[in-house]
Amino acid sequence: NPNGYFVDGPVLDMKFKSGIGMFPIPIAHGLTVGEFAQMVNGEGWLSNKVKCPVTIIPVANYTHDMPYTLPVKPSPNLNTQQSILLYPSTCLFEGTYLNHGRGTYFPFTIIGSPPLRGKYEFSFTPTGIKGMSETPLFMNQLCYGLDLRNYDVAELRKTKQINLQWMIELYKSSPNKEQFFDNKLSK
């Protein structure tokens, strides 16, 4: 887990269980796959309290503070180490009216919307990208906002917490505060 060095974020309310969130864990859970499997078994979270067989293969000298780069991208929209490390902080933008980089080759590292014109210099135009995001929010519209591609993720490692400052900044800059959050964020 590249973000295995910290635990932070809201815990899923199980009445909002979906294919995206299936278990009551925080956004940044800090677990290895083996630890997560043991937790699922131990808490009886599988249907009918089924237990899955788990074999743990220890990694010599592993600690949760060790930097780790995934050998394979976990999702077409988590295609860089930067996006993976920023994801616990930027995934919350999926519950807003902002485009969070879908429809670009930089998902979860750039965030913006057309109404932020004049408030930010950085801009991007989401387009349909087969296999990534074919109908992104604000498709073919110029969006203005934040570019986090060069953000020093070592800062996240220092604080060991989700960065909410970007959400606060973009909310304050938004001319549409009453429409900023969609109903997904309350779930």
Model regions and ranges:
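Active-site-proximal beta-strand/loop segments in catalytic clefts of secreted hydrolases
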Residues: 1, 59-61, 113, 151
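Glycine-rich, charge-decorated loop segments at or immediately adjacent to ligand/cofactor-binding or catalytic sites
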Residues: 2-15
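Conserved anion/nucleotide-ligand pocket segment
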Residues: 17-90
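Extracellular structured ligand-interaction cores
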Residues: 51-54, 105-107, 145
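Glycine-rich, aromatic-lined ligand/substrate-binding cores of catalytic
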Residues: 61-142
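Conserved functional hotspot residues or short segments at active or partner-binding sites
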Residues: 112-187
